UniProtKB/Swiss-Prot annotation:
Its EC number is 3.5.1.114. Residues 1-210 are annotated as: Hydrolytic domain. One of its GO terms (cellular component) is membrane. InterPro entries: AspA/AstE_fam, Aspartoacylase, AstE_AspA_cat, Aste_AspA_hybrid_dom. Plays an important role in deacetylating mercapturic acids in kidney proximal tubules. Also acts on N-acetyl-aromatic amino acids. It comes from Mus musculus (Mouse). This is N-acyl-aromatic-L-amino acid amidohydrolase (carboxylate-forming). Optimum pH is 7.5 with S-benzyl-N-acetyl-L-cysteine as substrate, 7.6 with N-acetyl-L-histidine as substrate, 7.6 with N-acetyl-L-tyrosine as substrate, and 7.7 with N-acetyl-L-phenylalanine as substrate. Keywords: Cell membrane, Cytoplasm, Hydrolase, Membrane, Metal-binding, Phosphoprotein, Zinc. It is a peripheral membrane protein.
């Protein structure tokens, strides 16, 4: 698998969104801070625009009010006729589409960085909806800038034809996910780390805009294979939970025959797949309602092509 060559047109319209989920507090408070102190997001060729994506859910300190905003930015929702009974997040998705889009047009923002926290032990994880070369080069840059801190890229290609995330409104985007952090809690270490990583990502965009050479390389990425539900009773209630041997081991190999769940009756449930997978978002609190105990991924080696050098030119923030 390899990604296609990407454009070297400079990225001048960049957004940093936080609070897409209103109880993921690093993004919430970074967005709030930058709305009052935007200088931290300025670079010579562009100034990233901070956005508090879901103000109502943020005020209520909940993931969402009516439906998941990060599943509501489809062209179907964005293009539908507004009604008074529309869910709040659908209304907000349309507002974000006016601000950052319109989705799928040349007028959309060049790049959106969406900030998230998870209760799972993912560490630093970039989530990309495509294997576009720029996103892989970005992840590689962060890995080289932070050799002691694992930074993994999780390729989450939506099933079907429609993308639905907040960053999908722009021409390109990526999600910066960090955990573990409880919902509604702000940890100083993760806050500082996310802030530093955002700075590094904006630095990379600036280097990209100025024509930095981006040679070809190889890297491991994790591609989503689907979800695994908890064991359940005939009535649909939980019959067990994540096994202690699996808990907190995100991005580590899970082999056939190894335990994945501990039933309340005491028995172990073993993984019955026929190949090694790499679980991600293990026991994520927000996924209980989605009937997801963890996501399965495959670890694949990709060859990322070089991006042709951009001849530096005078660029100013629009």
């Amino acid at each position: 698998m390899s990604s296609l060559p990407g454009s070297r047109e400079p990225l001048l319209r960049v957004a940093v969104t936080g609070g897409t989920h209103g109880n993921e507090m690093c993004g919430v408070y970074l967005a709030r801070y930058w709305l009052q102190n935007p200088g931290e997001l300025q670079r010579p060729s562009f100034s990233a625009m901070p956005v508090l994506a879901n103000p109502a859910a943020t005020a209520a300190c909940c993931r969402y009010l009516d439906r998941d905003l990060n599943r509501s930015c489809t062209l179907t929702f964005l293009g539908s006729t507004a009604t008074p009974d529309d869910p709040y997040e659908v209304k907000r998705a349309r507002e974000l589409n006016q601000l950052l889009g319109p989705k799928g047009t040349g007028q959309a923002f060049d790049f959106t960085l969406d900030l998230h926290n998870t209760t799972a032990n993912t560490g630093v994880c970039l989530i990309s909806e495509s294997n576009i070369s720029f996103n892989l080069h970005l992840c590689h840059y962060l890995q080289r800038q932070n050799p002691g801190m694992p930074c993994r890229l999780f390729l989450y290609e939506p099933a079907g034809t429609e993308t639905f995330s907040v960053e999908s409104i722009s021409k390109n985007g990526i999600c910066l996910e960090m955990g573990p952090q409880p919902q509604g809690v702000l940890r100083a270490d993760l806050f500082s780390r996310m802030r530093a990583l955002v700075a590094s990502i904006l630095d990379f965009i600036e280097l990209f805009n100025q024509g930095m050479d981006l040679p070809a390389f190889e890297m491991d990425i994790y591609r989503n294979l689907g979800s695994v539900d908890f064991p359940r009773t005939a009535d649909g209630d939980l019959a067990g939970t994540v096994h202690p041997q699996l808990q907190d081991h995100d991005f580590e190999p899970l082999r056939p025959g190894e335990p994945i769940f501990k039933l309340f009756s005491g028995e172990d449930v073993l993984y019955e797949g026929d190949s090694i997978v790499y679980p991600v978002f293990i026991n994520e609190a927000a996924y209980y309602e989605k009937h997801v105990a963890f996501l399965k991924s495959e670890k694949i080696r990709v060859t990322v092509p070089a991006l042709l050098r951009l001849t530096p030119r005078s660029t100013q923030t629009p």
